[in-house]
Amino acid sequence: IADMAKRYGLGERTGLEINIPRESKGIIPDPESKKKTLKALLRRHLNENRSVYMSRLSSDKEKDAAVDAIVKTLDDKKPMTRDEVYNFLQDLKVDSDKVGKDQRVPLADLLKYTYIDQANWNMADTMNVVIGQGSNAYTPAEMNRYAMALANGGDLHPLTLLGGKKHDKEPVKQVGLKPKYYKDL
C-alpha cells in the first residue's frame, strides 16, 4: 500500500513553487510512524502525570529513567501480559493502580491496552489505510496530483502555480501500471 501511494506521489512534495514556508508533504501511514507516535503520546502522558504515578520516586533522574523504561516496552518483541505490566510498574516503583489526569483506567491497564497492544501494525491498521481512515494525511495538492495521474494514464507531473513554467529538473514520472487498468477507471 505504501509503495503504491509513493508511486502516485503521495507523501512527497508536488513541485508547487511554495518556498516560504516550504511546501508541506503528506504522511503515508506505516508501522514505524505508528510506533513513533504512540511512544510520543505515552511519554507525554507519563510526563504530565509524574506527580500521580511516580510519587514514590524522589529525583527527576529516577522519574526520567522510569519514563524511558516504560516507553521502551513498546519495542518488546513479545508484548507483556497485564500481570507482567503490573509487576513491571511495581518494580519501577511506579503506582500502577493510579488513574492519570483525564483517564478512566489505572496506569497498568492504560499501558497494556492503549499502548502495548496497539504498538505493532496489524490487519486493522491496513484496513483503515485502505479505506482512507487512520493516519492518512495528504495535502490537497497531493490529492490533485494523484487524481491527475489517474486521469491521464499514469503520468505524474510536477504541479505548478505559474503558467508555462518548465520543470526541467523534475521530469514526468510514470506510475508504472498497465494502461488497461486506466481504461477501467
Regions found by a protein language model. Give the residues of each.
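Beta-lactam-recognizing serine transpeptidase/beta-lactamase-like catalytic domain environment
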Residues: I1-D184
